Each structure stands twice: as C-alpha cells, then as structure tokens.
Amino acid sequence: MKNFTTYLSTAPVVATGWFIVTAALLIEINRFFPDPLVFSF
C-alpha cells in the first residue's frame, strides 16, 4: 500500500488529475455560460 500511495503522489499522476479537473471545470462553465464575450457589463 505504501508503494501505491507513493505512485499516486508522483508528478505525472497529479498533473493528469489536475488537467482532468481543469477540463471538466471549463466544460461546465461553457455549458452554463456559452459565450461570455456577449456579456456587456
């Protein structure tokens, strides 16, 4: 189990998880606010 937790804390695994979270966040923001360029404040 110690080796598995060490593997999960390596940079490629952490970076992959971060990219997936970022992509999902951008997709959801664009789903609810499709074109923020048309907002005139």
Curated annotation (Swiss-Prot):
| Transmembrane segments annotated in the record for this chain | 7-27
Record keywords, A-Z: Chloroplast, Membrane, Photosynthesis, Photosystem I, Plastid, Thylakoid, Transmembrane, Transmembrane helix
Answer yes or no on keyword 4Fe-4S. no
Cell compartments where the protein resides:
Plastid, Chloroplast thylakoid membrane
One matching Pfam family is: PSI_PsaJ
* SUPFAM superfamilies registered for this protein in UniProt: Subunit IX of photosystem I reaction centre, PsaJ
Indicate whether Phosphoprotein appears among the record's keywords. Answer: no
The organism sits in which domain of life?
Answer: Eukaryota
Biological process GO annotation list?
Answer: photosynthesis
Q: What membrane topology was assigned to this protein in its record?
A: Single-pass membrane protein
Any one GO CC term of the record? photosystem I
Q: What family does this chain come from, according to its entry?
A: Belongs to the PsaJ family.
Job description of the protein: May help in the organization of the PsaE and PsaF subunits.
Q: What is this protein called?
A: Photosystem I reaction center subunit IX
